[in-house]
Amino acid sequence: RTDGQGAGAGVSGRNGSIRPWKAVYCERFAIERNWRYGRYCVRVLRGHTEGIMCLAFREKISQLSHPILITGGYDRTVRVWNLQTGETLRVLTGHARGVRCLQFDDCKLITGSMDRTLKIWNWRTGELLRTLEGHTEGIVSLTFKDLILASGSADSSIRVWNCQTGECFPLNGHRDWVNALQLWSGSSSSNSSDSMFLFSASDDFTIRLWDLRHRECLMVFQGHVGPVDRAQTCSWIHESIGRDRGRCC
């Protein structure tokens, strides 16, 4: 067996953890089997008054015994849900147009809107901590790690922010909407933009890799023949999925 193909090989999760591939396969197989035979329950969550454009889910939250779902919609609101009961815990208002992207951790929630702003919230209390302005068109993607936040916009630009100070710098190069962003660090313990990299996916059919320390594009990945909607990194591969139904690795 070669490296990466043996029983000990692992699969990298979104949080950087490594799980044995057999355990991941068994889990996915059980989910597929339960779905096929109707062994599942359905809960419909109602509250938004217009289309829902983004969501994020966390199963384990410190000091909480239930999973949390947060959704954003064209009704300009963000809703925090208790998935165990289906109850709306909080409704966050403040955006002037639809909410297109969001991400949250144990306490902090960041939302991006077509009103061209980012908002940083304490989702547990509902407090609005900061509003970030800089993009000239709506914000359609974001990603953050600790104090580093990157946002992508319909203005074709990326901005990298310090969540604490509100300072930012732009990354220019894409020629159309920036649909997806993914931070990547060479060191799992690094919280500084000095050692962080960023993948971006765009409607211009390309994916770009950026060096945040030098604020420059290191590489342009070309291959999709349509807009690229998603990008995801793992420990040994970078994968993107586009509207051309293609996949590049």
Model-derived features: positions:
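Conserved strand-to-loop turn within each blade of WD40 beta-propeller repeats
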Residues: G72-D75, T111-D115, W123, T136, ...
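Hydrophobic, ordered structural segments
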Residues: G98, Q103-T111, R116-K119, R124-L129, ...
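Intrinsically disordered, low-complexity acidic/Ser/Thr/Pro-rich linker and tail segments
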Residues: R1-I61, H66-R79, E87
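WD40/WD-repeat beta-propeller blade N-cap
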Residues: L45-I52, T93-V99, D106, T125, ...
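Short coil turn/linker residues within repeat-based beta-strand modules
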Residues: R39, T85-E87, A96, T125-E127, ...
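A detector of tandem-repeat and repeat-rich interaction/domain scaffolds
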Residues: P67-T71, V78-V80, T88-R90, C101, ...
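Loop/turn segments within WD40 beta-propeller blades
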Residues: A56-H66, L102-C107, T125, L142-L147, ...
